[in-house]
Structure formats: C-alpha cells, structure tokens
C-alpha cells in the first residue's frame, strides 16, 4: 500500500514547481527581491472614455540560472527560473462610458488589482480564465439594477490593505476585438 501511495505522489512531486531561490552560492552578497509598486493605470477601450485607477505592478529581481548539460545526461537538467509575479490579487469591474454609441453606451472592464508580489517559478500559469469567468458570472448575478460604481470580487484575497498612492503610470488600451 505504501508503494502505491509513493508511486501515485511521485509524478506530482516531479511536476511541482521548485521553491523560489533567495540566495546563490556564486553571489552570496546578492538577494532576490520582488515587491508591489504603486502605479496609476489608465483603463481604456476603443470609442470609450478612459479612466485612471490606482493599482500596483510587480517589480523585482528574481534568480534564474542554467548549468551546461552533458550527453548522455547523468543528472537532471540544472535549469531554474523565477519571476516577480502577483502572489495575491483581486478583480475589479471598471465601467467606461462610451458617449455617442447608442448600442453600447458603456463597457465593463475586468481589471486585476495586485495586492502582493513574490518570486515564483517562471512556468507558473495563473488561472485567470476560470477566475475571470466566475467573476463575470458573479457580477451579472449581483449587479444592482442601476448604478455605475465599481464592484469588487475576490480572486485570491478579499481586501486591499492600504489604498495605493500614485507615482508611476501604466497605460492600457484595447482596440476592437
């Protein structure tokens, strides 16, 4: 029975991302770092008025390395890659007014609001598609009959600990899809 459990868990262990590296033996005086920096993000859509919102962007230096291979390979490949990415985020609906468009007078945009960042495996895929779909369904069910105010929906965490202050700008513009 123990061999069955070990045999079932072993492939999952091989596929699991390695933990982030904070120090390297070759550079003992250098450390990885990753933090959420406050920005003003411009949310836009073709034919609509843009809105400025407070958000955060992940910025940092995380370690990656690659050691040359041998053939035939005697050990597993020595390649590692970490990237500064969101560790906690939530989604917010931002409603843009589209004057002069009678068919679509406003557009709702889902914006990822970053709460915290950390060094994580480069190949880590965020599960945004499912989260976006669920957020949109929740928004439709919970949307008041009237009122353009922003609605907050959780992805990983529910509350922003402090409102970000602006010192950097990021512009996001989408055309017709």
Curated annotation (Swiss-Prot):
Residues 143-177 are annotated as: Disordered. It is found in: Secreted. One of its GO terms (biological process) is semicircular canal morphogenesis. Keywords: Disulfide bond, Secreted, Signal, Tumor suppressor. SMART domains: CT. The keyword Chloroplast does not apply. Disulfide bonds join 34-84, 48-98, 58-117, 62-119, 81-122. One of its GO terms (cellular component) is extracellular space. GO terms for molecular function: BMP binding; receptor ligand activity. InterPro entries: Cys_knot_C, Cystine-knot_cytokine, DAN, Neuroblast_suppress_tumour_1. Its main location: secreted. Residues 1-16 form the signal peptide. Coiled coil: none annotated. Residues 34-123 form the CTCK domain. Pfam families: DAN. Belongs to the DAN family. May act as a tumor suppressor. This is Neuroblastoma suppressor of tumorigenicity 1.
């Amino acid at each position: 029975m123990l061999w069955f459990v070990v045999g079932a868990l072993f492939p999952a262990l091989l596929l699991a991302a390695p933990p982030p590296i904070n120090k390297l033996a070759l550079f003992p005086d250098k450390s990885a770092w990753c933090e959420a920096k406050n920005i003003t993000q411009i949310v836009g859509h073709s034919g609509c008025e843009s809105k400025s919102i407070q958000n955060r962007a992940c910025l940092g230096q995380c370690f990656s390395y690659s050691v040359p291979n041998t053939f035939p390979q005697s050990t597993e490949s020595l390649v590692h890659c970490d990237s500064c990415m969101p560790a906690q985020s939530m989604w917010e609906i931002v409603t843009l007014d589209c004057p002069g468009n009678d068919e679509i007078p406003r557009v709702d945009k889902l914006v990822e609001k970053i709460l915290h960042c950390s060094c994580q495996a480069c190949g880590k895929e965020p599960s945004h598609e499912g989260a976006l779909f669920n957020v949109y369904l929740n928004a439709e069910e919970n949307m008041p009959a009237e009122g353009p105010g922003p609605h907050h929906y959780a992805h990983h965490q529910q509350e922003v600990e402090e409102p970000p202050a602006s010192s950097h700008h990021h512009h996001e513009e989408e055309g017709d899809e």
